[in-house]
Amino acid sequence: TFNHNWYSEVGKYNLFNILEKCDVDHIMYTPSRSLINRSAKKSLYKIGDSCWHCHAGVGAFPLQVAVKFNIPFIIWGESIAEHYKATHYEPVPFDANYFKRVSSKLSSCEMTCEEISKRELCFFMIPSSEELEKVGVVGIHLGDYIFWDEERQVEFIKKYYGWKEDNVEGTYKKYKSVECKMIGVHDYIKFIKRGFCRATDHASADVRAGLMTREEGFDIIKEVDPERPNGLDYYLETTGMSEEEFVRVCKSLRDGKAKKLP
């Protein structure tokens, strides 16, 4: 497991509970608090959100473990095909291109700077093509083989594994990113940049699935999307940024029609 070091209490419970229920060995990498704080600030400037270390670590660390222990087969959850407008008739492979384009946005070398050394980012580096090919590592997305219905899957893991939900900043759904206490900051950045964030994403999907009406979706969006997350105070404290600097950087990243936002 890659530990983003922003675990909520419910997230910690769910992780260690499922390890007990499944009776499996477990390897976890936890980056230092100081690295997370420095990365979270640099990430905002570099890729336009606070979570480069999450994006890169969750992709790179499992691949490093696969190469080290000669594990050729990795099963991920859903691919981008589950949430974006493109239609993929073939399975979406998790490879170096997917890692850079969809997950990390920037490589560990591109994140290296005066404040962050290359050595500190060694676990955020994807193995070379030669290393992956030598082991024969293949990654698939489970959503390419079963109907990906998050609502039903959550019901299943709650019933059979005691998985817990909680209030999550930035959305009305109590299972989305419930393991992370900083997800509200990630989504609030999107709101400042684009004028909408995750409540819009989730409500749109629920309207398409027939779980709510369009009017109900708009009501939820108006209430949830603009709300300033409590996690922002922690982000500002740990990165040393002022709220004025934070908002200024987010607004500077606006593009297209979003440039007309107040």
Where are these regions (language model features)?
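Nucleotide-activated chemistry modules centered on ATP-dependent adenylation/adenylyltransferase
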Residues: 1-262
